[in-house]
Amino acid sequence: MPVTQFSHPDPYSYQTGFDSYHETEAVKGALPVGQNSPQKAPYGLYAEKLSGTAFTAPRHENKQTWVYRILPAAAHENFKAEDADSYHTSMTTETHKLHHIPNQLRWDPFDLDETVDWVHGLHLVAGAGDPTLKHGLGIILYAAGKDMGKEAFYSADGDFLIVPQHGVLDIQTELGRLMVRPNEICVIPRGVRYRVTLPAGPVRGYICELYQGHYQLPELGPIGSNCLANARDFQAPVASFEDEEEPTEWRLYSKFNNTLFSARQDHTPFDIVAWHGNYYPYKYDLGRFNTIGSISFDHPDPSIFTVLTGPSDHAGTAIADFVIFPPRWLVAENTFRPPWYHRNTMSEFMGLICGNYDAKTGGGFQPAGASLHNVMSAHGPDADAFEGASNAELKPQKVGDGSMAFMFESCLMVGVSEWGLKTCQKVQEQYNEHSWRPLKRHFKNPNKA
C-alpha cells in the first residue's frame, strides 16, 4: 500500500484535498451562515480575514480565509527587534552576506542542537531574491531540541515548505494541529501563526521558504488527470482552539525581512474557533507519490518527480520546485539509468531524508547532509556510480528502497550564507576530488591507428 508506515502515531483529524475550499468549526454554530462578517458573530467571536493574495487576484489564484476568533490578531504590544546574535536567518547584513560562487558544494550531516527551540534553531543556508519585493526563496536548515513555550511564530516573508529529516514536529497552528514526521512534508503559508513542540525528542530538517506566490501542484500535461502528488492526499487541519478566561503572557515572534522581532500579548494566539477558506497549512505523505518513469529507454528529465512548484512569472519556470527521488523501478533498455551528467540554468539544492541516493554510490552524500549545484555548475553521477551503471546487467531493478532524496530547484542563482559556507563547518572541501576527479577517460578515437 502506497502509504508510509510511521512509527509515531498521528492523533489528529484532517480535511483532505489540495487547494480545496474548506470549512471547519470546533464549536457547532460558530460559523456564520450565508455571510462572512455579521454585525455580531456567533458566540461573541470576532470575524477576521486572512489574505494570502491581493483581493483582485484571479479567482483561480485567490487565497483567503475567514476566521472567527476570541480576540483579533492585532491585540498585542509593539514588536521589537531581537538581538541579532539570537537568530540565524539574516541574509543581507555585512556579517551575514551571501556568497555567490560557482563551486559545487556538499555538506556533511548537519548537527542536532538540543539547546534551542524552533524559532532559534532556524539557520539560513542559501537563498536568492528579496522578501521585501516578494521575489525569491530562502533555504533553511532547522535543528532544535526544546519545545516552544507560551510562544507563537510566523513568517511575513513567505511560505515555509518543511521537510523533516529527524524527529517529529507537533505543530499547533491558528487553524488547527498537524503532526509532521520524516517522509512527510508540510507547508505553512505566509502569516499563519504556529507553535512547535517535539514529542519524540530533537528534530532536524530542511525548509524552502518561497517569497513569491504560493506552492502549487505541477501541471500534468499528457500524463493526464492523475499521478505524481494527487490532490486528494493532502491533509489540512480542523479547527482547534484554547479558551483562556484569565490573562496569560504570550510572546509572538515575527520573521520580517529575515529579521526576528517579538511582541507580547496577554492571551493565547490559538483562539480561532472556526474558519472557512482556501488559505491554510497542510501536510503530505511522500509515500503516496505516484512515480512516473521511462518504460522504454533513456532517463526522463527529473521534472517528472516534482511534488510542488512555486512558479515564476515565466510559464514553466519555477522560483522553487520541490522534487523527490522515491523508491522506483528502473527498466529502461540499453540506457545509462542514473541521472545523466548535467549543466543546468537552474540551481539545484539536494538533501537526503534517509537511505542512499542512487546517483551517489561512492559515499559522502548522507542523510541530514546536502549539496548545492548552482547555475551552470557541472554535476552528475560520481565515478563509482558511473562505473557501476555503465557495466550493470540491465534487468528490471528496484532502487531507492528505504531511501528518500529530494531537491529544491530554482531558476535563480543561489547565494550561500556565511553560516552555510563557513560557520557550520560542514562543507566537504574534497567534494570534486572525491566525486568527479577520479572519472577515467574511455574515449577511443576511431580515426587514430
Swiss-Prot record:
Pathway in which this enzyme or protein is active: Amino-acid degradation; L-phenylalanine degradation; acetoacetate and fumarate from L-phenylalanine: step 4/6
Source organism phylogeny: Eukaryota, Fungi, Dikarya, Ascomycota, Pezizomycotina
Entry's EC annotation: 1.13.11.5
Induction comment from the UniProt entry of this chain: Expression is induced by L-tyrosine. Expression is positively regulated by the cluster-specific transcription factor hmgR.
InterPro entries: HgmA_C, HgmA_N, Homogentis_dOase, RmlC-like_jellyroll, RmlC_Cupin_sf
Membrane-crossing residue ranges in chain numbering: none
Keyword list, A-Z: Dioxygenase, Iron, Metal-binding, Oxidoreductase, Phenylalanine catabolism, Tyrosine catabolism
Function summary: Homogentisate 1,2-dioxygenase; part of the L-tyrosine degradation gene cluster that mediates the biosynthesis of the brownish pigment pyomelanin as an alternative melanin. The 4-hydroxyphenylpyruvate dioxygenase hppD catalyzes the conversion of 4-hydroxyphenylpyruvate to homogentisic acid (HGA). The protein hmgX is crucial for this conversion and thus, probably functions as an accessory factor to mediate specific activity of hppD. The homogentisate 1,2-dioxygenase hmgA is then involved in the cleavage of the aromatic ring of HGA and its conversion to 4-maleylacetoacetate.
Coiled-coil residue windows: none
Gene Ontology terms: biological process: L-phenylalanine catabolic process; tyrosine catabolic process
Top-level taxonomic group: Eukaryota
Summary of the knockout phenotype: Impairs growth on L-tyrosine as the sole carbon. Leads to the accumulation of homogentisic acid (HGA) and its subsequent polymerization to pyomelanin.
Originating species: Aspergillus fumigatus (strain ATCC MYA-4609 / CBS 101355 / FGSC A1100 / Af293) (Neosartorya fumigata)
GO molecular function, a single term: metal ion binding
Cofactor(s) listed in the protein's UniProt record: Fe cation
Alphabetical list of CDD domains matching this protein: cupin_HGO_N
Catalytic activity annotation: homogentisate + O2 = 4-maleylacetoacetate + H(+)
Gene3D superfamilies documented for this protein: Jelly Rolls (2.60.120.10)
Protein family according to the UniProt entry: Belongs to the homogentisate dioxygenase family.
The protein's name in its UniProt record: Homogentisate 1,2-dioxygenase hmgA
PANTHER family recorded: HOMOGENTISATE 1,2-DIOXYGENASE
Class of enzymatic activity (EC top level): oxidoreductase
Gene that encodes it: hmgA
Activity regulation remarks: Growth under standard conditions leads to moderate phosphorylation of mpkA and hppD and hmgA activities are balanced leading further to degradation of HGA and formation of 4-maleylacetoacetate. Cell wall stress, resulting in disturbance of balanced hppD and hmgA enzyme activity, (with reduced hmgA activity), leads to HGA accumulation that polymerizes to pyomelanin.
Keyword Iron tagged: yes
